[in-house]
Amino acid sequence: LMGAIAAALSREDRLGYIAEQPTYGMLADINAFALGARMVNPYVEVHLEWARRKEAQHTEDILHEKGIHYISGHDMINPDHPSREYGLYRKNEDGTVTNLAMPVWHWGKFYEQIIRLAFKSTEEIEAMKGKKAVNYWWGMSADVIDVICSENMPNGTRRLIEFLKNSIRAGSFHPFDGLIYAQDGSTKCTDRKSTR
C-alpha cells in the first residue's frame, strides 16, 4: 500500500526506496512497494538506495539530487538519530519533509496468533496440512499490519488506501495474485495464479 500511495501522489515516474540491508524480508518489502506502485502507475520506477553505504552523503540526499521527491524510508524513528524521514514522505525542494504514511505492526495480535497456533493439537495441525500454510507472514488480513495516513494525505488518496485495506481484510483483493514480472522481464507469477 505504501507504493500505491507514493505512485498516486507523485507527478514523476520515479520513487525512492531506502533499505537497510539485503535480507530476505527486506527484499520482500521492496518488491511489495514496487508492486503497489505499479498497480497505480505502470510506468513508475523505484530507485533503491542502501542506507548502510560507506559514503558520507545521506541516501535521502542522493535520491533528492536525482529529482526523486517521494521516498519510502525507515519504518520507524531511530531514537539515536531522530528525523522526520521515516515511513513514506515527500522531500520538498527546500529540504523540508512532509510525512504521508507509515506502516504499524500490532504486535499483540501477532503474539495472539502465535499462541493460538501453539495451542492447536497435533490432530488439528495435521488436518490443516495442504489447506492452510503455517507461517508467520501475517499481514493486513490478520490485522497484524496496518497503514496510518497523515493529515497531509489528500482525501482521494486516503479513500483509495482505505478501500484497498478493507478489500485486503475482506479477502476480495490479493495484491500478490496475478501476472507479476521480474526486473529482467521474466514471469514470476502467471495470470490467475498466486504467490501466496
What is the meaning of each model-derived region?
Residues R11-L15, N41-V46, E65-Y70, T98, ...:
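Loop/turn elements at helix/coil->beta-strand transitions in domains of secreted/extracellular proteins
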Residues E55-G67:
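Short, well-structured alpha-helical segments in soluble
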Residues H47-E55:
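Short beta->alpha junction loops
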Residues K193-T195:
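Conserved small/polar residues in nucleotide/adenosyl-binding loops
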